[in-house]
Amino acid sequence: MTLLRGNGTLATFLGDVRDYGADADVVAFEIEHYADVTERALRHAVAVASTRWDVEAVLLIHRIGIVLLSEPVVLVAVAAKHREAAFSTCEFLTDYLKSRAPLWKREVRGDAISTLFDA
């Protein structure tokens, strides 16, 4: 996404897969989704954000499949004329992806044991 002419702000959030350290057996996460359901939910979240803040453009990217520890997993970018709108929208969408988006992750362990939970 490029910063559209006339906008003053591009707020971004880049999230990596956290290395939990103490549990050295976890080597990656496998992230799953149902494409239609997830895309619909993300479009709805962007629509909600657009009614709250005046933004010009939004880019959401969330990786699917195997993602190794410390690799980027999510990118949220928001272009707006004012930084408050850009930062607030970026925070709202980041929180949505973490807490409400229909994504599931499974721990990938070196010992082949895995646990499935909401992303």
Where are these regions (language model features)?
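N-terminal, polar/charged subdomain of small-to-medium soluble alpha/beta proteins
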Residues: M1-V73, A79-A119
